[in-house]
């Protein structure tokens, strides 16, 4: 779904890359993918995944996502993946600093009701267009959801 919505040559940031499923999938269209994770074992396996899949446009980063705006300084990204369902919304302010004009952010979250994180999103991106999709049931009272956030030109 994300790959089909991408344009050729996008710069992508995966804030919580793990072993790299999103970077591997998106590398065919992206100009550059910065794949970050705080877990050294995950980054080691990400590097291995990059080698095994012959990916030349994926840059692995070992770091805390809270520090990414400082670490990546003036870089801006066309697409940001935030797949940390228990806590990704807590990193929206950092994502706002890294989003290019017109960027799309994919925020994965566990929710109990529709629109649960809209206020958090609108605090970081006041004029964003938000589309929420429920992916699957997580427990009897919660859902795994994705918020597709179209930033617009406000950044």
Where are the predicted features?
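Rossmann-like S-adenosyl-L-methionine
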Residues: 1-155
